[in-house]
Amino acid sequence: MSFSAVILAAGKGTRMYSNVPKVLHTLAGKPMAKHVIDTCSDLGASHIHLVYGHGGDTMQQVLADEPVSWILQAEQLGTGHAVNQASSGLADNEKVLILYGDVPLISGDTLTNLLDAQPDGGIALLTVVLDNPVGYGRIVRRNGPVVAIVEQKDASEEQKLIKEINTGVMVANGGDLKRWLGQLKNENSQGEYYLTDIIAIAHDEGRAVEAVHPVNPIEVEGVNNRIQLARLERAYQAMQAERLLEQGVMLRDPSRFDLRGKLQCGTDVEIDVNVIIEGNVSIGNNVLIGTGCVLKDCEIDDNSVIRPYSVIEGATVGEDCTVGPFTRLRPGAELVGDSHVGNFVEMKKSRLGRGSKANHLTYLGDADIGDRVNIGAGTITCNYDGVNKFKTEIGDDVFVGSDTQLIAPVKIGKGATIGAGATINRDIGEGELVITRAPARTIKGWKRPVKQK
């Protein structure tokens, strides 16, 4: 179906007590407005118009890559006025979906139902029934059909008893919407142009108004303060955790798991508590993720174990690998397979070959390490001279002793052995043994100092 979307995002968000525009506050690591934009894009919106006001420069910087038309609402004169700012860009013969940048959990399924439910020439609007509707506009029906929406401040005592409320989300044809917007008046307690008044205008024209309920009521909850944002964050994470559990992923405690991107898992994946997933993460079969790990834009292949408190970003972990605890794999790190990096090891733009291991206290940067290599504790690839980065190449079956500095650019040939405490600043041939430390000396008769009285 062809439709365009208008997203209202001009509010200041006073109750957030922040210099950040309200719709840029993040939920699951993504600005609230982007959640709504992505949902519209996934549904195939032909155009997305974003109506902004406060913090416009910041919004355009943060959302610079989004497929939206920017519509300025210089004065905040109500929701009807906000939509009217975008009217010149709305096609007469296209459905127009009106959404809100601070209602981030609205789903594609709910919006599809709403678009499908729109009567010919009429309006479809999203409503919910609340036990406590205080503060919301009430849905006024007459013998069944919706005839009007009355805002809380303008409602009579009888109307305040109504429990069906307006969410603000609606769809109408572009031509009709523009005509109705032109008839709005600001004769109300707020002195604003209410978008909701078009319901009564449409009814007076004999147009049908259809009310639709969301798939899940949490979808239409908005955010005005940090308490509400935190509540939606937990609701979102609970939904993501439930989906993963249904797919066979074992989350040891679903309430202590955060998904801030997309996660693809194989079978028999186990994720311990307080794990954070960001960006696009792919996990193979029979993988264990330990407590406190952070995974971002990475791939972990079958039968690998990520031990607690490891951080993996932009890296690839091959099959049958062990990582951690307390390992950091930075962008460009690759463990080929059956390899091991242990506690306090950091890798960046480096490849660790099959069967190789760096078990302790090591930095590997811009390094290409072959198969079956042992990297001793305290080894550092010195890849940076203050201006440029240089590469370290280590062949297969090399043994690097503890506390070794490899000053790049440098090559270590296959089967070479480097003794502990070495500083290597030249290439080492295949099979060579290199020892750079001075011989140990013994001082006979030496005595420790005695504290003077």
Curated annotation (Swiss-Prot):
Q: Give the metabolic or biological pathway.
A: Nucleotide-sugar biosynthesis; UDP-N-acetyl-alpha-D-glucosamine biosynthesis; N-acetyl-alpha-D-glucosamine 1-phosphate from alpha-D-glucosamine 6-phosphate (route II): step 2/2; Nucleotide-sugar biosynthesis; UDP-N-acetyl-alpha-D-glucosamine biosynthesis; UDP-N-acetyl-alpha-D-glucosamine from N-acetyl-alpha-D-glucosamine 1-phosphate: step 1/1; Bacterial outer membrane biogenesis; LPS lipid A biosynthesis
Where is it located? Cytoplasm
Record's protein name: Bifunctional protein GlmU
Subunit info here reads:
Homotrimer.
NCBIfam families on file: glmU, PRK09451.1
Cofactors named for this entry: Mg(2+)
Which UniProt keywords are present, listed alphabetically?
A: Acyltransferase, Cell shape, Cell wall biogenesis/degradation, Cytoplasm, Magnesium, Metal-binding, Multifunctional enzyme, Nucleotidyltransferase, Peptidoglycan synthesis, Repeat, Transferase
What organism does the record attribute this protein to? Photobacterium profundum (strain SS9)
Alphabetized Gene3D superfamilies for the sequence: Hexapeptide repeat proteins, Spore Coat Polysaccharide Biosynthesis Protein SpsA, Chain A
Enzyme Commission designation? 2.7.7.23, 2.3.1.157
Residues reported to bind acetyl-CoA: 377, 383-384, 402, 420, 437
Q: Which family does it belong to?
A: In the N-terminal section; belongs to the N-acetylglucosamine-1-phosphate uridyltransferase family.
Q: What does this protein do?
A: Catalyzes the last two sequential reactions in the de novo biosynthetic pathway for UDP-N-acetylglucosamine (UDP-GlcNAc). The C-terminal domain catalyzes the transfer of acetyl group from acetyl coenzyme A to glucosamine-1-phosphate (GlcN-1-P) to produce N-acetylglucosamine-1-phosphate (GlcNAc-1-P), which is converted into UDP-GlcNAc by the transfer of uridine 5-monophosphate (from uridine 5-triphosphate), a reaction catalyzed by the N-terminal domain.
Annotated region (Linker) at 227-247
Note down the stretches annotated as region N-acetyltransferase: 248-453
| Record has Magnesium as a keyword | yes
Q: Could you say which residues bind Mg(2+) here?
A: 102, 224
What's the chief localization of this chain?
Answer: cytoplasm
User: A Gene Ontology MF term for this entry?
Assistant: magnesium ion binding
Q: Which GO terms describe its cellular component?
A: cytoplasm; membrane
Please give the catalytic activity noted in the UniProt record.
alpha-D-glucosamine 1-phosphate + acetyl-CoA = N-acetyl-alpha-D-glucosamine 1-phosphate + CoA + H(+); N-acetyl-alpha-D-glucosamine 1-phosphate + UTP + H(+) = UDP-N-acetyl-alpha-D-glucosamine + diphosphate
Which catalytic residues are annotated? 360
> What domain of life does the UniProt record list for this protein's source?
Bacteria
Question: What does the record note about the cofactor?
Answer: Binds 1 Mg(2+) ion per subunit.
Q: Which residues bind UDP-N-acetyl-alpha-D-glucosamine?
A: 8-11, 22, 73, 78-79, 100-102, 137, 151, 166, 224, 330, 348, 363, 374
InterPro entries from the UniProt entry? Bifunctional_GlmU, GlmU-like, GlmU_C_LbH, Hexapep, Hexapep_transf_CS, MobA-like_NTP_Trfase, Nucleotide-diphossugar_trans, Trimer_LpxA-like_sf
Q: A biological process (GO) annotation for this entry?
A: cell wall organization
